[in-house]
């Protein structure tokens, strides 16, 4: 079968590789669609990062480059391994693409996403969505309604990143949120916030991203910091109070500074983006306003709720697809 394989920085090859073996406890999936994540681009341009370099196998998967890429994908079940009796052939599914040690608990309340040596299918080994077929442990396979188009279903993985950021924030319906950055994660996070009943303000410079935010309907207000003073506008919108919660989705320090200034006293700031460079923060403001600054990474037991929001029609993923290849 065909697969996109990462060899090294700037070196991804389309190759013929053997089809995966569907072993006991796994599910064979024929891949329908796979998204290209910002992480994939970083691996190509700056990697290997998550991908274990050639000759340095990942401690859990035992694999190193070349690695089959792709972790945002949907597909149709074509085979089930021995012991799998709750998924049928022909079922539409998405994958929560974790690689964790076999002794790591993965039930409700378990923080398996923070476990030692955690990695992702499509980065750390075990196949990937940029291939024709993949075999995945049953635990990580999530059935979805056949009513969800499979191209849209491929976005459930990054949507779950947004859902976990929302959970980490502790926000509730009726709150006002400021999202700093309208890239894919910022937009999908905003879709989650709207579905959960929050008022959403987005700050973004890019004309294309502002247009996508408008087109998708995920923001009540879209502020361009090159045109307006974002903090002043936020204060007008919130009657001088500031927002209840803010989400940093840009890896840009000026955006983080804006969020610190725009959040109300005792408010929450969630750092969603992965920074590849040092950041600074106005600690005096954090202290004097008693702000709560939190990190978030990926997702943990978020997929079921995310899938439910899409199945119930509370989130439409179609506007977030920019191109199909």
Predicted regions, residues:
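Adenosine-nucleotide cofactor-binding segment
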Residues: 176-182, 194-258
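Glycine-centered, small-residue-biased loops immediately flanking beta-strands
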Residues: 267-268
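C-terminal substrate-binding/catalytic core of Rossmann-like NAD(P)-dependent dehydrogenases/reductases
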Residues: 231-232, 236, 274-323
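Glycine-rich beta-strand-centered segment in the early N-terminal region that forms part
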Residues: 20-34, 49-103, 145-147
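Helix-to-beta-strand junctions that scaffold the AdoMet/dcAdoMet cofactor pocket
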Residues: 263-264
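NAD(P)H dinucleotide-binding glycine-rich loop of Rossmann-like/cofactor-binding domains
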Residues: 59-66, 71, 99-180
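Hydrophobic/small residue at the entry helix of a nucleotide-binding pocket
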Residues: 161, 185, 209
